[in-house]
Amino acid sequence: MVNSSTSSDQLDVDLSFTPFPVQDLDVFVNSDTLELMKNPSKWIEEIGSWIRFIQVNSALKCPEIVLNSSQFSLGLELTNDKKILDLNHAWLGQSKATDVLSFPIIDETFFGVSNECIELGDIVISVPTAIRQAKDNNADLFRELRWLATHGLLHLLGWDHSDEESLHKMLLIQEQLLEIRGIL
């Protein structure tokens, strides 16, 4: 686990990052993807820009405390199918691996001080599942990992997809977040 912090667009993002052991990869990944899988500063830059985008777009909902804060802390773990299956079973009662899990700390009722660092929660991404999904969707792993991270972040910020309409809205926001970094 690596703890790292930096500013991104006037936001301070403190990230507890657990990289995926690249020696466990059974596919070739390009240097950008490899760097993303082991370098927390790449994620800090992305996550900071995504949060800032959400803050300045009034049409996008998130808890008031997030809108008024400039300091955030969260965890991001890149893991394997077994670990995410164990977490999915323990926390959600699902006996299957999944692509991404989010463990939010705040919600609309959260009361905090906006000049303090806001702990958002944790995002866990299964790299083997991301590899399979990237292949199935004719996408590259670089994009798929970011796609899953945006999905996890939106859950940390209060979004949910209990029906098709809310899922569609959430997926559109994910596309917007990736576009601001030029990934699509």
Swiss-Prot record:
Localization annotation: Cytoplasm
GO biological process: rRNA processing
Binding site for Zn(2+): 151, 155, 161
Pfam families referenced in this protein's UniProt entry, alphabetically: YbeY
Enzyme class of the recorded protein, top EC level: hydrolase
Alphabetically ordered keywords of this record: Cytoplasm, Endonuclease, Hydrolase, Metal-binding, Nuclease, Ribosome biogenesis, rRNA processing, Zinc
Coiled-coil regions listed: none
Cofactors demanded by this protein: Zn(2+)
Recorded GO MF terms: metalloendopeptidase activity; RNA endonuclease activity; zinc ion binding
GO cellular component: cytoplasm
Xref: InterPro entries: MetalPrtase_cat_dom_sf_prd (IPR023091), YbeY (IPR002036), YbeY_CS (IPR020549)
Cofactor note (record): Binds 1 zinc ion.
HAMAP family: Endoribonucl_YbeY
Protein name in UniProt: Endoribonuclease YbeY
Source organism of the structure: Prochlorococcus marinus (strain NATL2A)
